[in-house]
Design a protein with these regions (language model features):
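Secondary-structure end/capping motifs
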Residues: 233-316
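Short, low-complexity disordered leader/linker segments with a strong preference
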Residues: 1-35, 340-350
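Soluble non-cytosolic domains of exported or imported proteins
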Residues: 68-72, 87, 142-147, 177, ...
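Short, solvent-exposed loop/beta-turn-alpha elements that line the ligand-binding surface or hinge
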Residues: 59, 112-113, 215-217, 287-296
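Pocket-lining segment of extracytoplasmic ligand-binding domains
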Residues: 91, 126, 177-270
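Conserved C-terminal helix/tail region of periplasmic/extracytoplasmic solute-binding proteins
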Residues: 305-350
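Short, glycine-/small- and polar/acidic-enriched structural segments
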Residues: 27-163, 168-173, 189-195, 219
Length: 350
């Protein structure tokens, strides 16, 4: 997903000026575009960065604020006005909103499709074959309270472990770049791997999957982008511009040949000049978002509401999926484009 907060890239003073009204800290460019601060992911291109490069934004300008690997931290930064928007696993989004943070999901941000997913790997010689074998053992995850933890606990529950037994499975937080090594050296017993880390680890051999998010829930959107409610109210045009552009960029990824996607990503990474390794792009497979245009569905949030209620982390009835998200800005949901059309609303060849 996204990487640890690093340095800030400021918009040049000649380009950006502080808005005299509206949400505190909101800036505009000299030509009146709203500046959207965000955190990215090193060595990769996010859908909204792609949207900017494709020219899909008309009313907004992105401003990079470093990288992060923690979805919960990313959306917390958005909720506390350090950023204009963030992205995280839907379970973390539900917890944030249920806890009183005034944010709303506006677009799916990641998921699992046929080619891209998260796998939970064990060594071939580990002797681990079932969920019960994990009792007393360690699972390496990128952060707590997010995708890897929820998927792991849900799989253990579905495999018949009691709450007490699940509590004996230890989650160990590790940087994604170190997780494979920790597995191979015996520091952990299961490694949550995705993207380039999954592909390179599998290529080296000696490991296999114990479970995957795709096998647990099928092709599914797992995360969303959120904006603060006050920002949505005061700058609806900017939010609408971000959503329509990013939704179209996601659709572009869904219908464009892989070689063209990788070439475009490489060009974007070279142009932004952050000294990143483009060699990882060869492992790109797909957007990971199965729904055309990243339209949000009730079930993608309700399933985690139910999970939190079942695990006594949320009171039943406190929130529903419809309290958490809106599709009103998404052109693939609001009638602007046919639901399965291309990035410009055109018919897509099958």
């Amino acid at each position: 997903m996204v990487r640890a907060l690093a340095c800030t890239l400021a918009v040049p003073l000649a380009v950006a000026v502080l808005s005299a009204c509206g949400t505190r800290g909101v800036s505009t460019t000299a030509d009146g575009k709203i500046v959207l601060r965000y955190q990215g992911s090193t060595g990769t291109v996010t859908p909204f960065e792609l949207a900017a490069d494709l020219g899909y934004f008309a009313k907004t300008r992105l401003q990079w604020q470093g990288d992060t690997t923690s979805g919960p931290a990313n959306i917390q930064a958005a909720a506390t006005q350090q950023l204009e928007f963030g992205s995280a696993f839907n379970g973390a989004v539900v917890k944030l909103i249920a806890g009183g943070s005034p944010v709303t999901s506006v677009l799916s941000s990641y998921g699992a499709d046929e080619q891209s997913y998260t796998g939970y790997f064990v060594r071939d010689d580990s002797g681990i074959a079932t969920a019960r074998d994990l009792i007393g053992n360690k699972v390496g995850v990128n952060t707590l309270g997010a995708h890897h933890e929820f998927i792991t606990r849900e799989w253990l529950h579905e495999q018949g472990l009691s709450d007490a037994e699940i509590a004996r499975v230890q989650l160990v937080v590790l940087p994604p770049a170190s997780t494979e090594e920790a597995l191979r050296t015996g520091q952990i017993d299961v490694a949550a791997l995705q993207g380039v880390f999954l592909e390179t680890a599998v290529a080296r051999g000696g490991i296999h999957t114990l479970y995957t998010d795709k096998n647990l829930f099928g092709q599914f959107d797992y995360g969303t982008y959120v904006f603060r409610n006050d920002f949505i109210q005061q700058h609806a045009d900017a939010v609408g511009d971000f959503v329509q552009g990013t939704a179209r960029a996601i659709r572009w990824l869904q219908v464009t040949p892989r070689n063209q996607v990788v070439a475009r990503f490489a060009d974007i990474i070279h142009k932004r000049g952050r000294n990143e390794n483009t060699g990882l792009l060869k492992y790109y497979k797909s957007s990971g978002i199965p729904v055309p245009g990243a339209v949000i569905a009730d079930k993608e949030l309700q399933i985690w509401i139910d999970w939190l209620v079942r695990n006594h982390q949320l009171t039943a009835g406190k929130v529903t999926a419809k309290d958490i998200y809106t599709n009103k800005f998404n052109p693939y949901a609001n009638g602007t484009y046919p639901p399965i059309s291309g990035p410009g609303g055109e018919k897509v060849a099958k």
